[in-house]
Amino acid sequence: WAPWCGPCKMIAPILNQIAEERDITIAKVNTDMNPLSMGKFGFRGIPALVLFHNGQAVDQMTGARPKPMFDQWLGKYMN
């Protein structure tokens, strides 16, 4: 995430809606202020999402997507 990133701004309301519907926490990390976070997970672009379960990264996704694709992605890991 970065404040200047158009696709990041575009998916923000989608992610907020998903967080409410699924009762999950979605945290944003500003890559301008935390540049090492990109390399830690091997990302080359934003928006980049990492799915954690019990403190471990279990999957990741890069790029803006429509809500059904995020729901499908999360559905692999939760009901």
Summary of predicted features, one role per range:
Residues 36-39, 59:
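Pre-signature/interface helix of ABC/ABC-like ATPase nucleotide-binding domains
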Residues 6, 33-36, 68:
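Short alpha-helical
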Residues 5-8, 42, 46:
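Short hydrophobic/aromatic-rich motifs at helix boundaries and adjacent loops
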Residues 1-14:
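Conserved redox-active cysteine motifs that mediate thiol-disulfide chemistry
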Residues 11-36, 43, 52:
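Thiol-based oxidoreductase modules, predominantly thioredoxin-like and allied folds used
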Residues 3, 29, 61-62:
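Pocket-edge positions in alpha/beta enzyme catalytic cores
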Residues 44-79:
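Non-catalytic, surface beta->alpha helical segment in thiol-disulfide oxidoreductase systems
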